[in-house]
Amino acid sequence: MSFIKSRKKIVTTAIASSLSVIATSAIAQDEIAKLPTIKAQATAKQSLKVDQSANTKFVAPLLDTPKSVSVISKQLIEDTKVTTLSDALRTVPGITLGAGEGGNPNGDRPFIRGYSSESSVYVDGIRNSTSQNREMFAVEQVEVSKGSSSSLGGGGSVGGSINLISKVAKKGDSLEGSVQGGTDDYQRITLDGNKDFGNGIAGRVVVMGHHNNKAGQGDDATEYKRAGIAPSITFGLDTATRATLSYYYLKTDDTPDAGVPYNNPNNYAAGSGKPIDVKQGIYYGWKDRDFQKQENQIGTIKLEHDLTDSITLSNTAVYSKSKNNYVWTQPDDSQGNFINPTTGQLKDTGIWRRANTRITDTDSFSDQLALTGKFNTGSLKHSFNAGAEYSKAESDKGSYTITDPNTKNITGAVANGACSLGLVASNGWCTSTFNPNSKDPFLGTITPNRAVTTTTSETTSVYVLDNIEITPQWLLDLGVRWDKFDTELKTNATGVKVENNTDFFSYQAGLTFKPTENSSIYASFATSANPVGIDAGDGSETAVNANNKDLDPEKARTFEIGTKWDLFNDKLNATAAIFRTEKQNTRIQLDPTTYTNGGDSKVDGIELGLNGNITDKWAVSAGYTYLDSENTNPGPSCGRTGPCNPINAAKGKQLPNVPKNSATLWTTYKVLPQVTLGAGAVAMDKVYGNATNTKWVPGYVRYDAMAKYDVNKNVNVQLNVNNLSDVRYFSKAYASHFATEAEGRSAVVSLNFKY
């Protein structure tokens, strides 16, 4: 890869930034009081309430931060036993998960407040937007920032961003882990050991092994297998100069889920648009052909030096490598194989197992240099973070070539005889609508066709964030960031290149009034910019191409008014906010080959939250979000060929992947000194998959339960039952073709230990 050729420049950048930290140490005082490390919890006791973000770009406590931030705490992760980021995000209202056809069809594709945040996922404040299914085994907590926020993290972040906080070496000795088993061949083991070697040195290793089938589908269907390890070592604990080296590795080998077609395919538009009425847990995939193999690695070097007792200089250098290779079944509806176009009745003449394939190999490097701390200018007290960032990513994309003894099987076309009654029993490319056979033999060949295109993206940024205490009752929050973003797509066979080069400013401003020390009322404004190719071509965002190479970044802005209160001796946090996000300059299509900036959309909303302890025995994490979305100017309606229609049916419609109402609840109560009971619910309104609102999945309410028995102070046994009532619902709605059915009821027993 040409990425290797630029490694010398990258290494030089990292060394130069890191040496600036070390050189400063040499001229500083011999003894400097260490700036207290901010912890997610104020005390050693874990809680559902988190007071301070682990991201240093949040320069004030969350209570005094003028924007909505939801934190999935370590306690909530342990209570619910979530194992993936997608599972964890279901505990946050206002977030939905999107499906894809290519790029990232089965990976993390969250929508926050109505807009995609796939390219706005961070690990320890460093962008991590490659297409993948993220694991929770090495995650301490997850922070979800709501609203436009490019001033915090750069391009993207229209509806918000997600930051995963990693488990790294710390002071003290500890050993904890969990051995789990459950329904659907669920098997999982995690081990987390931290050793304090003295002299300011500590090491930590977290390991995980996992296997399960998708709940409700039985054997020979969707299957998940993965293993991971995350070692880290820290030097200089409790000193003015600290260094942390960490590594993360995750390997997965899954059989992906295929989903269920909608009931209004191309040949029967009169269908209502919901998924077809077939049995719960149906699986249209092809075990002998389908797979998804991922490998993700992250290496990090973080250096910190306290210039004074209130100013810290830090540098974080990260190199990551990601692979995502798959062949998965899209249960295609484009050929009209399974429905009678006259009556709309389902036919058992077969679902075409269209093969979607991808080979992606992405390398990236990021370096962040930051100066953080506190200082005064007269009577004004500043808490700030100022820094510079550089990143470069290179993504090779290819696909698999699939051959078959009978080419009509691959096309799925009825005109060629595919999916006829005579082929259902013998042709794996088409399977029964009502009783699909996942074990059909695959007689073809799968050949990799690697590195068809290479996308290179480079970002240079500088920013300043400042929280100013004007008086103890009035706080002013300001932020500005400048990004230069360059992206290039090269077709390797021809050498043809297209590129998009842009730069943009992002801003945030907020004013906070504190009626009391433990409360705040705020008003804020923030912007974001979404340039072409923000995910470096590795994901569902459209990469730069000949049609969009000259377009400007999409723009968004969020207005928010809210309040936050710490109640019951600061053990419980209550929040409320009203907001509007407006997206402007959206890329729209004028004809089959011409795009421009000209679209608009908006989301108005209300958000309520409650996190922490009502009593010492009763804990709760709850939230509600109302989203009123509208596609105010979608542009003309254009197909792949032919002229565009100036009248677009999407105008005035609800945005895709945006439920009007969504709510989450998790609560636990210690009924006896050794017994804790928990219950949860997730509720969501109807969600549309496409812009014209003709494809949709119904709303639902899902219930969960937990019971935990403390054998002693170090060991407990925990039972989690998810989807208690075994309700059938769909977790993802794609814009065409299919929706993804969620898991049925499952139960997991865990033996947990902590020393």
Residue ranges and their predicted role:
Residues 210-215, 221, 227-306, 321-362, ...:
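Acidic/polar loop-and-plug regions of large Gram-negative outer-membrane beta-barrel proteins
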